[in-house]
Amino acid sequence: MKNRSDILKKCYPLVATGSWDAIAISDIEKDIKQTRGAIAYYFKNKKTLFANIIDELFFPVFALSDDEREKLSKATVSDFYNKYKTPFEQIRDDLRDNYGVENPSQAIFNLFIQGSKHYDQFTSNVGELMQLEQDFMSRIVGGRVNNILDLNRVYVENIGNIFIESMNFD
């Protein structure tokens, strides 16, 4: 492990799948194969480490990038619906594809629980990002169709599907 971003990337699955309260620095050392000194060099404590994980790995994926917004704003309505992923789907796919999390749908719920417990303003930051997302979707879709898209229904159905996926009925 060479740098700060490597430590964050190795710790993110721990946050997504575990209880931050129960994870000790010694556990982090073992899991990411780094010494306490290397971790402390970049992060003064667990709270700082957690905040950096959320700020640098969770929120950037939860929010649509400017490039994604640009592409979606130019898409046809059917392409928009085929390409658009809710913030929850973006997090789920990122956890699965980039971090190898086995049950990323379950991990989403855990991230929200951990974030609301250990990150000041987590809930309000998520709310602000969701409002930006809804405003963006309303501008894109609202200008192209006559009927009103019930954004709350879209998100409720999406969260319901992710919840069912998280149940791991295998």
Positions of the model-derived regions?
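Short, Lys/Arg-enriched anionic-surface-contact patches
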Residues: 1-3
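Helix-turn-helix
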Residues: 6, 10, 14-56
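Hydrophobic/aromatic residues within well-ordered alpha-helical segments
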Residues: 46, 53, 57, 61, ...
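Hydrophobic alpha-helical connector segments
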Residues: 52, 66-102, 152
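Amphipathic alpha-helical packing segments from all-alpha helical-bundle domains
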Residues: 78, 100-149
